[in-house]
């Protein structure tokens, strides 16, 4: 089996790289701007390259990975915040994650065509993980509009003109699945107290 590789955006102190190594996925690079968390990951994962500020990265220039994980800042989505949602300066950085994945896939598609390989199911990154707070389900101009945007933007990485219906009953459920042509998107709310890290 081919080894999976991880790129970690909004890396913090390396939670995604730690989870990856516990699941036989090799962390290759990370993006973070805060010095202390970067020092922690440099110590814990010396082989992982630090790429810096997500807003200054271009996906075509990043090392190819199979998985992109990111937990964009939650302050604008959180029920404890001002609820600016994805329009907020911090939580809106989610769109940078989508941009980078699209740029990486475009570059990988080009590379594979140059080598005359089949492309559709092998374009990398193949997987994207987004971690955030349950407040994402209810933020936005209309209740839950931001999570609707998240789902559409993630689906549009694979299918540019896809349209996702709003939540049945007007509210997003804590778990769900979207099946598309050659892609799927799933979401789950995990309660941290059951994972040994009550918050």
Tell me the role of every PLM-derived stretch:
Residues 2-6:
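Extreme N-terminal starter segment of soluble prokaryotic enzymes
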Residues 8-14:
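Class I SAM-dependent methyltransferase "Motif I" SAM/SAH-binding loop
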Residues 47-53:
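Conserved SAM-binding strand-loop segment of SAM-dependent methyltransferases
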Residues 34-35:
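Conserved SAM/SAH-binding beta-strand->alpha-helix loop
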Residues 41-42:
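Conserved SAM-binding loop
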Residues 65-71:
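Short SAM/SAH-binding signature in class I
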Residues 27-28:
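Short beta-strand element of Class I
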Residues 57-65, 77-199:
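Class I S-adenosyl-L-methionine
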